[in-house]
Amino acid sequence: MVDEAEVARMIKKAKEGDKRNFTQTLEFIMVFKDIDIKKGFAINETVQLPKTSSPSTVCVLASGDMGVRAKNAKADMVVDADGLEKLGTNKRESRKFINRYDFFLADTQLMPVVGKVLGQILGPRGKMPTPVAFNAPIESFLERFRSSVRVRARASLSLSCKIGDETMDDADLVANAMAVYGTVEKKLPQGSKNVRQIMVKTSMGSIVKQSGTVA
């Protein structure tokens, strides 16, 4: 396991870098070892962060009652069946649309349509929607995904994800980093033994590496 005190040191060091005229994000980076990426190694996880500064954007693909409830719950966007079919007629607009949102939730009844019209674009981006049953509490799903980040590595021995921004307390950023680490570690063939290095950096800052190795 990685030491929380070491993660705290790295975050503190990263935040001490030069200030910019905008709020910089904090990125948590993991580098792996002893994994054969040719054997299909991939990570695509959704991690709910204990603390957040700005919510992730969530689009709901639903019609009828679920669509209404999603709108009432202030989903960033709600697209019904007709809207999906329309998106499917323009791939360029579909790509632009998909890039606007971090996560997608979809009524299970619409999943066949989603796969047909947007699957070829959503799939490679690791953004295939999470299915939601018609009678499920879409409000709870929205709350969870707004405080989540996507952690993804595909044919690569490293990954990077946002854990917050420089305005957040160090302790909150540490909690977020540990949540990401814990989720990824469980997906590695040999757990922490497959972690070569962890690093932290701000948007425009230098990379801060850990001291020693993860054991």
Curated annotation (Swiss-Prot):
Q: Where on the tree of life does the source sit, at the highest rank? A: Archaea
Matching entries from InterPro entries are given as: Ribosomal_uL1, Ribosomal_uL1-like, Ribosomal_uL1/biogenesis, Ribosomal_uL1_3-a/b-sand, Ribosomal_uL1_arc, Ribosomal_uL1_CS
Q: What is the disulfide pattern of this chain? A: none
Annotated Gene Ontology cellular components are: large ribosomal subunit
Please give the coiled-coil regions recorded for this protein: none
One of the entry's Gene Ontology molecular-function terms is: tRNA binding
Role, per record? Binds directly to 23S rRNA. Probably involved in E site tRNA release. Protein L1 is also a translational repressor protein, it controls the translation of its operon by binding to its mRNA.
NCBIfam families, per this entry?
PRK04203.1
State the name under which the record lists this protein.
Answer: Large ribosomal subunit protein uL1
> What organism does this protein naturally occur in?
Cenarchaeum symbiosum (strain A)
Organism lineage reads as: Archaea, Nitrososphaerota, Candidatus Cenarchaeales, Candidatus Cenarchaeaceae, Candidatus Cenarchaeum
